[in-house]
């Protein structure tokens, strides 16, 4: 189950990396970030005279160009002038910096670059030995690319909302599919980054638990010697120790008691307290001893009287 989950996570990471990079590249390279009504201005020289034609038409713009969709200049695109001559920037320095950042488009370009390196790390993780360290690098690249992307989107929205040169000419505007491609790229990049970091953390925990268990096993086996070695060690220690053959303190105590001292522990009987039972017991003991003493004598006499047991000497 874990292998299946890990395979799904790697699939999500690979597909997401490709999708995020493709969407952001298309968004940066196309001119459909914003639809608005504006004036298409063009210059034409005829007979050393410059004629200006101003016409309010529907336009679509990207990060660097604006193209006309209607009127006499339909299909004509021109470079966006973020610093027109009639604009006064000395009164508002923040707006000037915003226009400079908007003109450079540094954050969208940085996002594309980070997504590219993140995709390379994901591809390298399939072949590199330390794949999990490469996956961690990919996660960092994707998270950074997403942050750069969202900063660029915020700067773009702020620049369009606070553009004094087009505030009067623009009556309505809406964001195009290039803008939404960039937004989707941000979401996918963050998801891929989180999944990549999760893969690294999970694998790192598994490796740490495995190494900890192996270390415990090694330490346990190192402390306990083999059975044969322990058995030999015990037998050798028993044979070499001089005290092992000595008697225990309890047995020493029993064996050291002399036979002469036994009388000290015997209890004397009072002859006045002798009963009939004690007299019968004494008679039985006397009869038993008499029979025991007489039996060997009778047995010896039978052996001597038996002619089969007599020794015969040859004549």
UniProtKB/Swiss-Prot annotation:
Primary site of residence: membrane
InterPro entries to which the protein is assigned, alphabetical: CACNG_subunit, PMP22/EMP/MP20/Claudin, VDCC_gsu
Any one Gene Ontology cellular component term annotated for this protein: glutamatergic synapse
Keywords from the named record: Calcium, Calcium channel, Calcium transport, Ion channel, Ion transport, Membrane, Phosphoprotein, Transmembrane, Transmembrane helix, Transport, Voltage-gated channel
Quaternary state and interactors: The L-type calcium channel is composed of five subunits: alpha-1, alpha-2/delta, beta and gamma. Acts as an auxiliary subunit for AMPA-selective glutamate receptors (AMPARs). Found in a complex with GRIA1, GRIA2, GRIA3, GRIA4, CNIH2, CNIH3, CACNG2, CACNG4, CACNG5, CACNG7 and CACNG8. Interacts with AP4M1 and GRIA1; associates GRIA1 with the adaptor protein complex 4 (AP-4) to target GRIA1 to the somatodendritic compartment of neurons.
Modification Phosphoserine occurs at: 248
TM regions (residue ranges): 8-28, 104-124, 135-155, 181-201
Protein name as it appears in the record: Voltage-dependent calcium channel gamma-3 subunit
């Amino acid at each position: 189950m874990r292998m299946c989950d890990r395979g799904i996570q790697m699939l999500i990471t690979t597909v997401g990396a490709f999708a995020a990079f493709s969407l952001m590249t298309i968004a940066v390279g196309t001119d459909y970030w914003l639809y608005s009504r504006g004036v298409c201005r063009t210059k034409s020289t005829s007979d050393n005279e410059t004629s200006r034609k101003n016409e309010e038409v529907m336009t679509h713009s990207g990060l660097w160009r604006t193209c006309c969709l209607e009127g006499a200049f339909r299909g004509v695109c021109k470079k966006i002038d973020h610093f027109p001559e009639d604009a006064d920037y000395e009164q508002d320095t923040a707006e000037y910096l915003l226009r400079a950042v908007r003109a450079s488009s540094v954050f969208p370009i940085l996002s594309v670059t980070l997504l590219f390196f993140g995709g390379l790390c994901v591809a390298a993780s399939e072949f590199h030995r330390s794949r999990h360290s490469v996956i961690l690098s990919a996660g960092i690249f994707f998270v950074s690319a997403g942050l750069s992307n969202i900063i660029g989107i915020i700067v773009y929205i702020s620049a369009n909302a606070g553009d004094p040169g087009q505030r009067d000419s623009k009556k309505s505007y809406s964001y195009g599919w290039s803008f939404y491609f960039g937004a989707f790229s941000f979401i996918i990049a963050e998801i891929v980054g989180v999944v990549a970091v999760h893969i690294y953390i999970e694998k790192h925990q598994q490796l740490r638990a495995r190494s900890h268990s192996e270390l415990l096993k090694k330490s346990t086996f190192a402390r306990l010697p083999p059975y044969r070695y322990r058995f030999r060690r015990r037998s050798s220690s028993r044979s070499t120790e001089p005290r092992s053959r000595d008697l225990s303190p309890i047995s020493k105590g029993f064996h050291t008691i002399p036979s002469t001292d036994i009388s000290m522990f015997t209890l004397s009987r009072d002859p006045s307290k002798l009963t009939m039972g004690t007299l019968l017991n004494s008679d039985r003991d006397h009869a038993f001893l008499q029979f025991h003493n007489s039996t060997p004598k009778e047995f010896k006499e039978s052996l001597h009287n038996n002619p089969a047991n007599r020794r015969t000497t040859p004549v």
